[in-house]
A protein has these predicted regions:
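Boundary/linker segments flanking structured domains
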Residues: 1-89, 93-173
């Protein structure tokens, strides 16, 4: 009887950590950022950062640029195939303004009160990795965030933005 109880508890604990991933090639292509978009080149992204070290925000996060905005993501990295086993949990953006930048945005996450963000940290805080794509073009930052969220549909992004439709430019007069 004890074995069943323990197995049941282990199963329920495992179940609480399950995450739904939604791979969909049609959605990928429908929200494709374009071959010439610099966000597609891994060399333009930061190196991998372990978000927390010993329960505190890592020095790498604290030392991120304060003169850039950009796109960022929280993800898990599996231990068995660390070169290929990635699970994107959240994608966000930090606009570049006098009061906002990529470093300030990252530092805010431990105090974030949104339910989904709290759940992400409750379940995964010791396993979260972080990468960012620095940028100062706020229009590009917003477009890239929308395209990436719509194509990947990360588990902890509560809102999936509407698609941006760009109409051809026409002369006003």
């Amino acid at each position: 009887m004890i074995m069943r109880y323990r197995a049941y508890n282990a199963f329920n604990k495992d179940k609480s950590l399950e995450i739904l991933f939604r791979p969909n090639p049609v959605r990928w292509m429908d929200n494709f950022v374009g071959n010439d978009n610099p966000i597609r080149d891994v060399a333009n992204w930061s190196s991998e950062i372990k978000f927390l070290k010993d329960g505190k925000i890592s020095d790498e996060i604290r030392n991120m640029p304060q003169d850039k905005g950009g796109i960022y993501m929280f993800y898990l990295k599996g231990p068995n195939l660390p070169f290929a086993e990635y699970y994107i949990l959240y994608i966000g953006r930090a606009l570049y303004t006098p009061s906002e930048n990529i470093c300030k945005r990252a530092m805010h996450y431990l105090k974030d009160e949104r339910y989904m963000i709290q759940e992400m940290f409750d379940n995964w805080k010791n396993d979260l990795y972080y990468r960012y794509f620095p940028d100062t073009d706020n229009i590009a930052i917003e477009k890239n965030e929308i395209a990436l969220i719509r194509s990947i549909v990360p588990t902890y992004n509560e809102d999936i933005p509407n698609k941006i439709e760009e109409l051809p430019k026409v002369k006003a007069f």
